């Protein structure tokens, strides 16, 4: 097993996750089996209870793990399915060690950070690195580990010390350290500054780790003189200093790394069994990046949510829309609309903001209402849904978005004016959306319904069923407590709003479609978590196709085209995917 540790310096948020994912993509393109681990030094057990404004989106894995959004990058770039134990937190490590101490596993010894915490970290990494993540059930050959935060943070000291010890345990030929650092370029002088990187590497070396590769993040390509200066002061060869400057899309990052010869250096330093790295995967990646930059047609989607002030809150939603737009050769124009801005209270307090929000909504080719919690902003979402339904604007509702779509239809089309969710009004006379908990024993706790669940299609006449390739069932990831009340489903009989997907027991309503509408779909699950750059999520793809007027053409041609996995030579997906590039789209 080979281990590649990615650390960061100067500031956080400079792209360690994307760089780690890109390195994994390059190695996978060389025919190697790659897994990934993200270390978050916070004391929380997982990301499940975070405020969206604190850490952005909570990414959900197949096994129900609620993790950092960087694991979403790993899954999307590498086309793998990770587990909750691929996300290590300080809280998990301490809980693990304390539980062992309570059981008496340490035989009365004094339990300390060194060696007990550091040993637990190393043991966790070694065990999880062996777990297959690509569906082939073969052990990974390389584990890419991202250490969150920056070198010098007090929260991460135990992890740095653990890897200082681990480099000797794994042996030099199996351990590789990549340090990502910022090279700022002040606008006043325009000169690229190396001092922050020098100090960062000095701090890293002072803690016992020496970088094998320094990745410089900068706004523009770094000059050779800057590279040589970093090389001299940081005790590495010039070819061990590479630059990842700001690019038009993140799909360029693996190509930038590959162009600068990292594969050859990995091969020599780690003794990797690489014969030819010019694989079909890297060619596809380059073609996708080139196509992204050539896009001319624009599709505008309005995202109506309550966490729009921080874009990371909807990171996977944005990626899923981007994947779908790219698949049909359109550039995505995603317009974030705070749902409160659509409400009458905003009209009274700030008329300009109110009218700007409604203008965005009116200009949108499609409308998306994503998941969320709490009553704040729900009135604005209901108004956006009503606009989409009555004006025949393509609409996709995710989780809460689906629940609100059902409530809006019941109030305005079934004359059930009191229809509501018990989340917002516990004593509502018409509890259309109710708490349907699923007990989750263990650390995830609570009553959240989490992870991969099967949805069975109940009708052949479903747009979404066709988009998934006419399969009898699908498996998607969930994260919710509330669902449509199955006891009130009979109210919708012989109406346009049809429940076309249910869970395996037929008790939970998973998919709803409005038959009299070009594309009005709600799903209880979160399909964005399964979207991949070369395998877009069908519900999102349908929204983009409908918004560009190509849905019917796509559905007609799906039956004529062969199905294939658009990413690699093997796939364990529960649905096939048409070759979108062959579709005759306008």
From Swiss-Prot:
Active site, per annotation: 399, 526, 528
Record has Transferase as a keyword: no
Enzyme Commission designation: 6.3.4.2
Residues bearing PTM Phosphoserine: 568, 571, 574
GO terms under biological process: 'de novo' CTP biosynthetic process
Pathway of action: Pyrimidine metabolism; CTP biosynthesis via de novo pathway; CTP from UDP: step 2/2
Domain of life: Eukaryota
Cellular component terms per the entry's GO annotation: mitochondrion
Catalysed reactions, as listed in the record: UTP + L-glutamine + ATP + H2O = CTP + L-glutamate + ADP + phosphate + 2 H(+)
Disulphides: none
Alphabetized GO MF terms: ATP binding; CTP synthase activity; identical protein binding
Pfam families for the chain: CTP_synth_N, GATase
Residue ranges of domain Glutamine amidotransferase type-1 in the record: 300-554
Gene3D superfamilies in alphabetical order: 3.40.50.880, P-loop containing nucleotide triphosphate hydrolases (3.40.50.300)
SUPFAM superfamilies given in the database record: Class I glutamine amidotransferase-like (SSF52317), P-loop containing nucleoside triphosphate hydrolases (SSF52540)
Keyword list, A-Z: ATP-binding, Glutamine amidotransferase, Ligase, Nucleotide-binding, Phosphoprotein, Pyrimidine biosynthesis
Function statement: Catalyzes the ATP-dependent amination of UTP to CTP with either L-glutamine or ammonia as the source of nitrogen. Constitutes the rate-limiting enzyme in the synthesis of cytosine nucleotides.
The family this protein is said to belong to: Belongs to the CTP synthase family.
Protein name: CTP synthase 2
């Amino acid at each position: 097993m080979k281990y590649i540790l990615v650390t960061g310096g100067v500031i956080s948020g400079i792209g360690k996750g994307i760089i780690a994912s890109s390195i994994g993509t390059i190695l996978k393109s060389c025919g190697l089996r790659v897994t990934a681990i993200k270390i978050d030094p916070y004391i929380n057990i997982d990301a499940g209870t975070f405020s969206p404004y604190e850490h952005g989106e909570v990414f959900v894995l197949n096994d129900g793990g609620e993790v950092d959004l960087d694991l979403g990058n790993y899954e999307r770039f590498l086309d793998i399915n990770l587990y909750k134990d691929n996300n290590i937190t300080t809280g998990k490590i301490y809980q693990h060690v304390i539980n062992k101490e309570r059981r008496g596993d340490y035989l009365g010894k004094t339990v300390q950070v060194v060696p007990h915490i550091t040993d637990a970290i190393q043991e966790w990494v070694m065990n999880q690195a062996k777990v297959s993540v690509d569906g082939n059930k073969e052990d990974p050959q390389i584990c890419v580990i991202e250490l969150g935060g920056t070198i010098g943070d007090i929260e991460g000291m135990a992890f740095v010390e653990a890897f200082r010890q681990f480099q000797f345990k794994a042996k030099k030929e199996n351990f590789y350290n990549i340090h990502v650092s910022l090279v700022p370029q002040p606008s006043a002088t325009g000169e690229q500054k190396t001092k922050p990187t020098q100090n960062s590497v000095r701090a890293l070396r002072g803690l016992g780790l020496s970088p094998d590769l320094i990745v410089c993040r900068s706004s523009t390509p770094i000059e050779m003189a800057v590279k040589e200066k970093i090389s001299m002061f940081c005790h590495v060869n010039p070819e061990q200093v590479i630059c990842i400057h700001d690019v038009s899309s993140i799909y360029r990052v693996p190509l930038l790394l590959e162009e600068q010869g990292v594969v050859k250096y990995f091969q020599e330093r780690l003794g990797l069994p690489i014969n030819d790295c010019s694989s079909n995967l890297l060619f596809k990646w380059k073609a996708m990046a080139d196509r992204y930059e050539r896009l001319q047609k624009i599709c505008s989607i309005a995202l109506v949510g309550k966490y729009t002030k921080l874009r990371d809150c909807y990171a996977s939603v944005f990626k899923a829309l981007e994947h779908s737009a790219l698949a049909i050769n359109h550039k995505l124009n995603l317009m974030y609309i705070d749902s409160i801005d659509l409400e009458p209270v905003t009209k009274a307090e700030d008329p300009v903001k109110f009218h700007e929000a409604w203008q965005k909504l009116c200009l949108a080719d499609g409308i998306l209402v994503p998941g969320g919690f709490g009553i704040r902003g729900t009135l604005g979402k209901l108004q956006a849904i009503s606009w989409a339904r009555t004006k025949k604007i393509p609409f996709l509702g995710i989780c809460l978005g689906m629940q609100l779509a059902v409530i809006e239809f019941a109030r305005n089309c079934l004359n059930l004016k009191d229809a509501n969710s018990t989340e917002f009004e516990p004593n509502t006379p018409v509890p259309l959306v109710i708490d349907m908990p699923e007990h989750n024993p263990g650390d995830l706790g609570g009553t959240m319904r989490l992870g991969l669940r099967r949805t069975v299609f109940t009708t052949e006449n479903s747009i979404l069923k066709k988009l998934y390739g006419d399969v009898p069932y699908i498996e998607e990831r969930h994260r919710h407590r509330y669902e449509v009340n199955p006891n009130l489903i009979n109210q919708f009989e012989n109406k346009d709003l049809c429940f076309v997907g249910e869970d395996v027991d037929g008790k939970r309503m998973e998919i709803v479609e409005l038959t009299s509408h070009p594309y009005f779909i709600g799903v209880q699950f979160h399909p964005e978590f399964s979207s991949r750059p070369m395998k877009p999520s069908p519900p999102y793809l349908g929204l983009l196709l409908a918004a560009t007027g190509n849905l019917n053409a796509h559905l007609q041609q799906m039956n004529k085209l062969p199905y294939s996995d658009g990413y690699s030579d093997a796939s364990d997906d529960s649905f096939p995917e048409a070759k979108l590039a062959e579709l005759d789209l306008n």
